[in-house]
Curated annotation (Swiss-Prot):
Glycans are attached at residues 85, 363, 441, 464. This is Receptor-type guanylate cyclase gcy-19. SMART domains: CYCc (SM00044). GO terms for molecular function: ATP binding; GTP binding; guanylate cyclase activity; peptide receptor activity; protein kinase activity. Disulfide bonds: none annotated. The gene is gcy-19. It comes from Caenorhabditis briggsae.
Length: 1214
């Protein structure tokens, strides 16, 4: 009982613990009827190849644990039935054994297989069957820490991931970031599993980065030294920190021998062994006796010793001094009990309740316990504590797997400890594997120790690393001086990279080795060096003087280089300076260069114009020279560049860069300067920025600020000039007028220019700003009655009502804050005036918009351009619309193809048509109707009548030639040829006209009827444009005359056809119309209509009437009688203009253009009479082109008449 120690780490005792501890002091016998038998299933490994977890060398630990529990006063009410089945670390066998234990036999508790693969399956099955499952042996993988996945698994082994995080914490403390990972080959890959978790910890650790340069397996046998050497040689060239996972004693000793042979036991190397077996530098004794020679403080035999000595014990011990071992605590509460366990474990395996009867178990009595037998002892001991605690508190929960699992955590309520678990504290007992405590993940809380050998070759704990659930590791140091950890390294921590590098070729050279030759050389050349230094000293002095002269030469300008420009060039620059900006100057010819730069002289320096001011010659010292050098270096957008000073003439000339627009005083003084508020802001802002730059420069003040010293460049940017020359006297005594810009304190005193302070510049800036805002000279002297002396006197007098310029904006809208700022700047008290920095900041906030003045001007021009583009686009649209209207109007007057040629300036040649049909109509008794109407009523009558006629025309392939008074002339077959359909189009048009007239009503004469007389003729015709002014599309030929005669010889409401028209109609459209012969009629043709034909009778002609359509033959065609109610809506004029070509080959028949009167039309209702005795010809017909066409169309008779006409014309000219 004295060997069981409970340690309360983070709280006090609880009632449950009190019950446990009370049972340790008094053991009450339990009646047999009340005793309970715990059925335990053990998934074991029998193979002798797995000695570290083999059941023959491990199973006796359960009997010893049961005996230990009884001796300590626990499990008094329990008996145990142990049932063993073997898995041999096979997954399928593990599944079979798990099914047998948990499903078939339903054991109270199962001790799982000590291998990871079958244990994973059994842990999953335990979750399903809610069976408590105990883990030991090689089960260290981090996946077994998932309490949600394996809630019934309790693992006595610490997980290797915690080992990995603790190792990385050590790396961080020692500043090791380059390591090698070695692991022993094993049938179960147990060392590889640990190394993989270590590598996972290295990758997941966020606070420190470690580079794994080698990850390699080392053989565990004795026959692979060459492979071992190859691995170690690879490490030697890459790193010095070696981490190794080697579990058993023999491979560990071999590792010590191999690193000794490969010279890896120097002060540069650190070898770290990882383990979870609580053995540190020790090993299990070879026999059943306890360690008696050179034992470690843990009671174990050192790993480097073998009996009998093979000659390597001492060398292996020296190699072990280069080792650090990270393992579970090896502290054992009772070394005597450890020795008893070691000697009896093998013999106990055949005793009940284990009762192993195999041959291996019977032979195990002479063998030492396996490497993990102690962990089996501790896990069963832990289970015994848990069931005892449940039996004493709530025996019903003995059948509750979850309650048993929770009881094994040895938890109790109390103050929480965030280091381990946020709601529970953890109790610890000391077992054979050290301190044992289970966390909330049902996994052992690892208390890892870092062991090293001290000067007595005994292991000592130098660090205590405890891993918590949140992934962190807390470190408790076991030393006060780190040098004690590195006792075998002369007290110095090894470096990640040796000083000389991994191959020893990068050692830093000593001073003598590196600089010895130089030291000896220096001794030989000291004399020469001293001489050289003296020479260099004088050379430097000379060079400094030359450099100073060179720098002075930069600002010293020879007078001969300043050339006076010609007078013409002066005038050109003057005009340029005034004209190129936002100004309203109208007469620039009167502006001269002199009044643009009234305060400066103009010169050319290196072909560039410059400005200059004259000063009397004076003595200049070095300070003045340095000032001029600094002046040349001043550079700011609002500071005029100081070019230099000419001092070799009768007077000094200060040269400044040219600003082509002149001074602000001169520009405002012209009186014709127009600016907007933004320009005002820009100028004032530029002056303030320039003044701010000067105040922050070495000058600290301008001291001569006025509108005359503010120049404007081509970009309308204000630049301050005439600064920094305070030590140079003025050529003349300063004019009284300049005092208008001086501050009152300057006027009152006798201050020299270099004594003027910054507030005086602020005052001058305010005066200039008033000039800009009012666009008038300072104090508006041209309109004031006061003289300059009076104003200066009042300024000097000061007082509460001191005089200041008027800020009359003359209707310009300006930010009121700017006016307030200006008034503050010319305050009487200099201390009340704001500084240049404050003024600049305020002006930035007041600016109506960002950007400079040129951007403003460009924006104005851009807006103007945009507006102009919009206006041009609108005007273009209007022009296009008007052009379209004109084209539509022209299309009504002339055929489109004719109009297009005329618009292109081309000649329109007459065109002959072989067959057309001409239509003439006349209103019957129109003269009598006109007498009954007013002129306006006559116009309205004809407009209503002919407008509807025009609409009817659009439904037929007819072209309207003209209408004169009550006469109406149409033609079909031109200008677009339509074969023989022209006769039908005209007949259909005539019938529709007649039908419409029957329905037509005269509004003011409702009883009167409108009747038409229609004449139709078919035949050849010539059409062309006559004249250049008001051209007309006219028809020529006998066909037109005959058609006119048909109309004049017709009858009211009748359609009169000539024989040619009737023959054409009957030939192509027989039986479609009701016709009748009128008989023979005497027809006469008047002059003009017949081409070059005098009054000559046509003679007797047979003519015909067309009455109506013959519906029996025409059917339901579209050529029925016209109904004005069904008339189609007239299309828009824009749609009437088609895309036909100029040759007239594709004109739509329903879109005839409108034309003017044909001069060749015959007079209406001419009485027939005899022909004239002498031929008379129309002058309209005298056209060479028409004459040529006439010769092509008419017969020999026409040609004879033409020759007769030419003879008469010749006689008339004579």
């Amino acid at each position: 009982m004295e060997h069981l120690i409970f340690l309360l780490i983070f709280g006090g005792y609880s009632p449950s613990i009190a019950q446990i501890t009370s049972s340790t002091t008094t053991t009450t016998p339990v009646p047999a009827a009340n005793r309970r038998t715990i059925r335990v299933g053990v998934a074991a490994v029998q193979s002798t190849e797995l000695d570290s977890i083999g059941w023959p060398m491990s199973g006796g630990a359960i009997n010893l644990a049961i005996q230990k529990l009884r001796d300590d006063g626990f499990i008094a009410a329990f008996d145990f039935e142990i049932n063993v089945n073997y898995t041999e670390c096979d997954r399928s066998l593990g599944a079979a054994v798990g099914m047998e234990f948990m499903r078939s036999k339903k054991y109270d508790v199962v001790i799982g297989a000590p291998c990871q693969d079958p244990m994973e399956i059994m842990a999953t099955m335990a979750t399903y069957y809610t069976t408590p499952l105990l883990a030991w042996g090689l089960v260290t993988d981090s996946k077994f820490t998932d309490a949600e996945r394996y809630p019934y698994l309790t693992n006595i082994m610490a997980n290797s991931l915690s080992l990995g995080f603790s190792l990385v914490k050590l790396f961080e403390m020692m500043d090791w970031d380059r390591v090698a990972l070695l692991y022993e080959t094993s049938p179960q890959d147990y060392p590889l599993s640990i190394i993989n978790d270590v590598e996972t910890a290295i990758n997941e650790y966020e606070d420190y980065s470690v580079n794994v340069v080698v990850k390699q397996a080392v053989p565990s046998g004795d026959l692979n030294d060459a492979q071992y050497i190859s691995v170690l040689n690879r490490i030697k060239s890459r790193c010095r920190i070696v981490v190794a996972v080697i579990q058993t004693a023999t491979p560990r000793r071999k590792y010590l021998r191999m690193i000794t042979e490969q010279n890896m036991v120097s002060d540069e190397y650190v070898h770290i062994w990882l383990g979870l077996r609580s053995i540190g530098f020790g090993k299990q004794s070879a026999g059943l006796t306890k360690c008696e020679l050179n034992c470690l403080s843990s009671g174990l035999t050192p790993v480097w010793e073998v009996l009998p000595d093979d000659g390597w014990n001492e060398r292996a011990k020296l190699a072990a001094t280069r080792l650090l071992v990270m393992d579970l605590s090896t502290d054992v509460p009772d070394v005597n009990y450890l020795n008893t366990f070691t000697s009896q474990c093998g013999a106990q395996v055949v005793n009940p309740p284990v009762s192993c009867e195999t041959e291996q178990c019977k032979n195990a009595s002479t063998s030492p316990p396996s490497a993990f037998a102690r962990s089996l002892h501790d896990v069963f001991y832990l289970y015994g504590l848990a069931i005892t605690n449940i039996y004493n508190t709530n025996p019903v929960n003995l059948a509750n797997g979850q309650a048993i699992n929770d009881a094994m955590q040895l938890t109790f309520a109390g103050d929480c400890s965030a280091q381990f678990f946020s709601k529970k504290n953890i109790l610890t007992f000391l077992g054979l594997t050290g301190e044992v405590s289970i966390n909330a993940n049902n996994t052992r809380v690892p208390k890892l120790m870092l062991y090293a050998l001290n000067e007595n070759y005994d292991q000592a704990s130098f660090m205590n690393l405890t891993y918590s659930l949140d992934g962190g590791a807390s470190v408790s140091l076991g030393y006060t001086n780190e040098a004690s950890l590195w006792f075998w390294y002369n007290g110095k921590r090894p470096l990640t990279i040796p000083i000389c590098g991994f191959l020893g070729t990068e050692c830093p050279q000593t001073f003598v080795d590196q600089y010895g030759a130089l030291v000896f050389s220096i001794g030989g050349v000291l004399a020469l060096a001293m001489l050289f230094l003296i020479t260099c000293f004088f050379y430097v002095l000379r060079q400094r003087k030359l450099e100073r002269d060179r720098i002075d030469a930069e600002w010293q300008i020879p007078l001969v280089k300043l050339q006076v420009p010609p007078k013409r060039e002066k005038e050109r620059m003057s005009k340029r300076s005034i004209q190129s900006g936002p100004s309203n100057i109208t007469d620039t010819s009167k502006m001269t260069f002199d009044n643009t730069f009234s305060n400066y002289s103009i010169f050319y320096l290196d072909k560039e114009p410059v400005l200059s001011t004259a000063h009397p010659a004076s003595n200049l010292d070095r300070t003045d020279y340095d000032t001029f050098v600094k002046l040349r270096k001043l550079d700011h957008d609002n500071i005029n560049k100081f070019v230099g000073l000419s001092i070799d003439g009768a007077e000094y000339l200060a040269v400044w860069k040219m600003c082509m627009r002149g001074s602000l005083q001169d520009i405002i003084g012209q009186g014709n300067f127009s600016i907007d508020p933004f320009f005002m802001f820009c100028v004032i802002r530029d002056m303030a920025e320039g003044l701010k730059y000067l105040h922050n420069s070495f000058l600290h003040v301008h001291a001569n600020l006025r509108s005359g010293t503010v120049l404007i460049n081509e970009s309308w940017q204000a630049k301050l000039t005439d600064f920094g020359l305070g030590n140079l006297a003025e050529e003349k005594k300063p004019m009284k007028r300049r005092q208008l810009w001086m501050a009152p304190e300057v006027i009152r005193g006798t201050l020299l220019p270099h004594q003027v302070e910054k507030p005086a510049d602020i005052y001058s800036l305010a005066i200039i700003a008033s000039e800009v805002l009012t666009r008038k000279e300072a104090w508006n002297m041209s309109e004031r009655k006061d003289t300059v002396d009076e104003i200066v006197y009042r300024i000097k007098k000061g007082g509460p009502n001191s005089i200041r310029p008027d800020l009359d904006m003359d209707g310009v809208e300006i930010n009121h804050s700017l006016l307030v700022l200006i008034r503050d700047c010319w305050s009487e008290d200099p201390t009340d005036r704001p500084g240049a920095d404050i003024i600049c900041n305020l002006l930035k906030n007041m600016m109506p918009k960002k950007g400079n003045l040129m951007d403003h001007v460009f924006n104005i021009l851009e807006d103007y351009t945009t507006n102009l583009e919009v206006e041009v686009e609108d005007r273009t649209k209007e022009l296009t619309a008007e052009k379209k209207k004109a084209d539509v109007l022209l299309g009504r007057m002339l055929p489109k193809q004719v109009a297009e040629r005329l618009k292109q300036g081309q000649t329109v040649e007459p065109e002959g048509f072989d067959s057309v049909t001409v239509f003439f109509s006349d209103v019957v008794k129109f003269t009598q109707l006109s007498q009954k109407c007013s002129p306006f009523q006559v116009v309205n009558l004809l407009n209503d009548l002919y407008s509807n006629f025009d609409a009817i025309i659009e439904e037929h392939g007819v072209y309207k030639v003209e209408s004169i008074g009550d006469g109406y002339l149409c033609v079909s077959g031109l200008p677009q040829r339509n074969g023989n359909a022209h006769i039908k189009c005209i007949v259909e048009l005539s019938l529709d006209f007649m039908a419409y007239c029957k329905a037509f009503k005269i509004p003011h004469l409702p009883r009167e009827k409108v009747e038409l007389r229609v004449g139709v003729n078919s035949g050849p015709c010539v059409a062309g444009v006559v004249g250049l002014s008001m051209p007309r599309y006219c028809l020529f030929g006998d066909t037109v005359n005959t058609a006119s005669r048909m109309e004049s010889n017709g009858k009211p409401s009748h359609i009169h056809l000539s024989a040619a028209a009737y023959t054409l109609l009957m030939k192509h459209y027989p039986n479609q119309y009701n016709t009748a012969s009128r008989g023979d009629v005497i027809i006469k043709v008047g002059p003009l209509l017949g081409l070059f034909r005098p009054f000559q009778g046509k003679g007797v002609m047979e003519t015909f009437w067309v009455f109506e359509r013959n519906n029996q033959f025409m059917g339901n065609s579209s050529n029925m009688a016209y109904n004005p109610e069904n008339k189609k809506k007239q299309k828009n004029d824009d749609e009437d203009v088609d895309d036909e070509s100029s040759d007239g080959s594709s004109r739509a028949p329903n879109t005839p253009p409108m034309h003017d009167v044909n001069a060749n039309s015959p007079p209406r209702q001419r009485k027939p009479g005899p022909p004239s005795s002498s031929p008379t010809f129309s002058k309209r017909s005298v056209s060479p082109i028409l004459e040529e066409k006439a010769r092509e169309i008419h017969n020999e008779e026409t040609e004879a008449l033409y020759r007769q006409f030419r003879r008469q014309e010749t006689l008339a000219l004579m």
